[in-house]
Amino acid sequence: MYGPSPDTRHPMEGFDQVCFIKNVVHNPNIVVGDYSYYDDPVDSENFERNVLYHYPFMNDKLIIGKFCAIARDVKFVMNGANHKISGITAYPFSIFGNGWEGATPELGDLPYKGDTVIGNDVWIGYDSLIMPGVKRSEERR
């Protein structure tokens, strides 16, 4: 078969702004298929900086299929960004400590949208914002 190896970091020789994402992520809760790439002229290997509020205790996953094209400055907002809105306040008192720890909601009381899943062959354009729990299926033409 022709084409670059899916295990290559930078599939275009001399053009480091494009990288195959699966070869640069270290978070086990980010799963990326072969040939999906991220294009960023500043630091293409630091894809994980675009996955926001992805706390281990939330146990949510970002799953990206094969052959996806992800442009510069795309952000994935994960479930850790959600605030409890069913009580008196949505303010996260507990994260500031100093006696406010008792206001910590149970994990099950926080809004949870599930894993964020991007199917195969999906293009995500420049500066897009993908919210928690979004499921985007394969690209259709």
Task: Please identify what each model-predicted range represents.
Residues E139-R141:
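Conserved small/polar residues in nucleotide/adenosyl-binding loops
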Residues M1-P4, D34, I88-T89:
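Generic detector of short, locally flexible boundary/turn motifs and exposed helical patches
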Residues M1-N29, F93:
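Extended, small-residue-rich solenoid/repeat segments and analogous flexible loops
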Residues V18-F20, G33-Y38:
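A composition-driven signal for long, intrinsically disordered, charge-rich low-complexity tracts
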Residues I30, Y37-V134:
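Flexible, glycine/small-residue-enriched loop-and-beta-strand segment within the central core
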